[in-house]
């Protein structure tokens, strides 16, 4: 008998909203649109934008500890870094394709930096990159 009583309670709970169909449907429709609207807000949220601003700021403080940077200048530098990385990646991809390789190694990156950056800037970039790779390799072991 107890299980039947338990079954009756949910069924009576189900009957109570069914008794006032018209108002319940209107409320549910309102709830659905409100839920959908709040669901849209939750889905939209804040999309995370990956930038190099924290790294640029750290380098700035290493070079000039008492100097600040505006948001616009940071945005310009971020665009610059993205552009250079894209150029290097594209060139490295072409080099790998020319050599019929499916993997971009440090050699392709180094060659693409030499091709993209002019003269002395390329030399400094290659030496800093080599130093960074050496440091990473020694710390990984």
UniProtKB/Swiss-Prot annotation:
SUPFAM superfamilies: Histone-fold. Residues 1-10 have a biased composition (Basic and acidic residues). There is a cross-link at residues 8-9, 26-27 (Glycyl lysine isopeptide (Lys-Gly) (interchain with G-Cter in SUMO)). It is found in: Nucleus; Chromosome. It comes from the Eukaryota. InterPro entries: Histone-fold (IPR009072), Histone_H2A/H2B/H3 (IPR007125), Histone_H2B (IPR000558), HISTONE_H2B_site (IPR055333). The modification N6-acetyllysine is found at residues 8-9, 15, 26. Residues 11-22 have a biased composition (Low complexity). It holds the Pfam family Histone. Gene3D superfamilies: Histone, subunit A (1.10.20.10). The keyword GTP-binding does not apply. Residues 1-49 are annotated as: Disordered. Keywords: Acetylation, Chromosome, DNA-binding, Isopeptide bond, Nucleosome core, Nucleus, Ubl conjugation. There is a cross-link at residue 135 (Glycyl lysine isopeptide (Lys-Gly) (interchain with G-Cter in ubiquitin)). The keyword Nucleus applies. GO terms for cellular component: nucleosome; nucleus. One of its GO terms (molecular function) is protein heterodimerization activity. Monoubiquitinated by the ubc2-bre1 complex to form H2BK123ub1. H2BK123ub1 gives a specific tag for epigenetic transcriptional activation and is also prerequisite for H3K4me and H3K79me formation. H2BK123ub1 also modulates the formation of double-strand breaks during meiosis and is a prerequisite for DNA-damage checkpoint activation. Acetylated by gcn5 to form H2BK11ac and H2BK16ac. H2BK16ac can also be formed by esa1. Acetylation of N-terminal lysines and particularly formation of H2BK11acK16ac has a positive effect on transcription. PANTHER family: HISTONE H2B (PTHR23428). Belongs to the histone H2B family. The nucleosome is a histone octamer containing two molecules each of H2A, H2B, H3 and H4 assembled in one H3-H4 heterotetramer and two H2A-H2B heterodimers. The octamer wraps approximately 147 bp of DNA. Core component of nucleosome. Nucleosomes wrap and compact DNA into chromatin, limiting DNA accessibility to the cellular machineries which require DNA as a template. Histones thereby play a central role in transcription regulation, DNA repair, DNA replication and chromosomal stability. DNA accessibility is regulated via a complex set of post-translational modifications of histones, also called histone code, and nucleosome remodeling. This is Histone H2B. The lineage of its organism: Eukaryota, Fungi, Dikarya, Ascomycota, Pezizomycotina. The gene is htb1.
